[in-house]
């Protein structure tokens, strides 16, 4: 039985993880975020009501679930408080359900200023970050100058550390990027305002999760972004600044890796990508427009239009290798309704004429790659809202089976709409 389940994206993010986490948390006691920051955008639709979460784990709407923000997450106090307020206005008792690791690095206003100044300076070579300070906060963590949630317990010491790090970053902002420096006094006053709230939510996350495991409590680890955006294994440099893969779970939460059970890979029935970077199966025709319009492909965090393309089994094989995926959840199957034919990328023809069955890693290696497609018949029937396999047309079942054959991994869950009830569960991860 998979008591400890990891839910992560196997593409370039935006795969529909939030809905699936919310659905599966009916059986969980804990939901843990282990990487990323408020650059994530997890959309939940419950009985028609839409909720978008950026930082708080997607289990927060369940009254039986403890939600934890692990040490691998870079935490923006401003974003957290805004998100908490929105939920509390709707009657969600966030403070009773949400807990934070004291080792979470803080995202502060100078990180945001740096992020935006750098993207502007890159011009046409911009990476396409969300501009929310995620990358600079991770840089400070690795450089060992970052401030953490635990530093807020001693504000005198915090003020000294803040002054030192801001002198360093303001020098860059003024003299290299030629923009206004960030006010030290303003940042310090801001920090004094939220220190009590954040420190009141701190727990020993490793100890809490280990005790939960020993009790047999079900724990879910919620990934943000997607495998192909991983800082180490993604299409570098067009990646995020954290480990979005299964390997990030242990490092970003302090939970022992040997105790992880089922790895659920979330994948759209087609592919999307936000921002710059390689995308071999990208469509520039009316089919791409159809996917974008019908799939409402606009980022939950940035509002940016997503690039759309066919399902890429080559990139998926790389994601499976990295994450040791147990089973897939295939989302947005209904977006393919009405297409006469559907294509799957089964290989890449490389510039030297060789055929790659697993995608390269660095972005440069994707240059002049030609996708090799297999064409399958589409279906005219609607799959929207289907709750059983019997409701799916045979051609849709054939498409799902072909994905299983090409990847070697079973599709255990199929999502046919945004609501948590619009789902077909063949194998439940907590029962696998």
From Swiss-Prot:
Its main location: cytoplasm. Pfam families: Adenylsucc_synt. Signal peptide: none annotated. GO terms for biological process: 'de novo' AMP biosynthetic process; IMP metabolic process. Mg(2+) binds at residues 14, 41. InterPro entries: Adenylosuccin_syn_GTP-bd, Adenylosuccin_syn_Lys_AS, Adenylosuccinate_synth_dom1, Adenylosuccinate_synth_dom2, Adenylosuccinate_synth_dom3, Adenylosuccinate_synthetase, P-loop_NTPase. Its EC number is 6.3.4.4. It is an enzyme of class 6 (ligase). One of its GO terms (cellular component) is cytoplasm. Binds 1 Mg(2+) ion per subunit. GTP binds at residues 13-19, 41-43, 306, 332-334, 415-417. CDD domains: AdSS. Substrate binds at residues 300-306. It is found in: Cytoplasm. Transmembrane segments: none annotated. IMP binds at residues 14-17, 39-42, 130, 144, 225, 240, 304. Keywords: Cytoplasm, GTP-binding, Ligase, Magnesium, Metal-binding, Nucleotide-binding, Purine biosynthesis. The active site is at 14 (proton acceptor), 42 (proton donor). One of its GO terms (molecular function) is magnesium ion binding. Pathway: Purine metabolism; AMP biosynthesis via de novo pathway; AMP from IMP: step 1/2. Plays an important role in the de novo pathway of purine nucleotide biosynthesis. Catalyzes the first committed step in the biosynthesis of AMP from IMP. Homodimer. Belongs to the adenylosuccinate synthetase family. HAMAP family: Adenylosucc_synth (MF_00011). This is Adenylosuccinate synthetase. The gene is purA.
């Amino acid at each position: 039985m998979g008591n400890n389940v990891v839910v992560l994206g196997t593409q370039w993010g935006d795969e529909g993880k939030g809905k699936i986490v919310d659905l599966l948390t009916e059986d969980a006691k804990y939901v843990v975020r282990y990487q990323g920051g408020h650059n994530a955008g997890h959309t939940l639709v419950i009985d028609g009501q839409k909720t978008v979460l950026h930082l708080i784990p997607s289990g927060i709407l369940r009254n039986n679930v403890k939600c934890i923000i692990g040490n691998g997450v870079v935490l923006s106090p401003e974003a957290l408080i805004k998100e908490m307020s929105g939920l509390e206005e709707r009657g969600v008792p966030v403070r009773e359900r949400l807990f934070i690791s004291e080792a979470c690095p803080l995202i502060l206003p100078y990180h945001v200023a740096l992020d935006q100044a750098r993207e502007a300076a890159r011009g046409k070579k911009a990476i396409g970050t969300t501009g929310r300070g995620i990358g600079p906060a991770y840089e400070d963590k690795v450089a060992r100058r970052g401030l953490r949630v635990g530093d807020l317990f001693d504000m005198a010491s915090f003020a000294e550390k803040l002054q030192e790090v801001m002198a360093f970053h303001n020098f860059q902002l003024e003299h290299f990027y030629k923009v206004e420096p960030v006010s030290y006094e303003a940042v310090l006053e801001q920090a004094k305002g939220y220190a009590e709230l954040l420190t009141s939510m701190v727990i020993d996350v490793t100890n809490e999760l280990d005790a939960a495991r020993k009790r047999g409590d079900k724990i879910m680890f919620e990934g943000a972004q997607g495998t192909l955006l991983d800082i180490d294994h993604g299409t570098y440099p067009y990646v995020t600044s954290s480990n979005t893969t299964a390997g990030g779970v242990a490092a970003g939460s302090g939970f022992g890796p040997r105790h992880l059970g089922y790895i659920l890979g979330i994948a759209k029935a087609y592919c999307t990508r936000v921002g710059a970077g390689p995308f071999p199966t990208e469509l520039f025709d009316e089919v791409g427009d159809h996917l974008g319009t019908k799939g409402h492909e606009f980022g939950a965090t940035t509002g940016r239009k997503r690039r759309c393309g066919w399902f890429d089994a080559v990139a998926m094989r790389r994601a499976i290798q990295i994450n040791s995926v147990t089973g897939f959840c295939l989302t947005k199957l209904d977006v393919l309704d009405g297409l006469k034919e559907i294509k799957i990328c089964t290989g890449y023809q490389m510039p030297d004429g060789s055929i790659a069955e697993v995608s390269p890693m660095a972005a440069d290696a994707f240059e002049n790659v030609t996708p090799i497609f297999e064409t399958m018949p589409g279906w005219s029937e609607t799959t929207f809202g289907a709750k059983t396999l019997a409701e799916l047309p045979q051609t849709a079942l054939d498409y799902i089976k072909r994905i299983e054959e090409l990847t070697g991994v079973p599709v255990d869950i199929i999502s046919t709409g945004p609501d948590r009830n619009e789902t077909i569960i063949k194998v439940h991860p907590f029962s696998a």
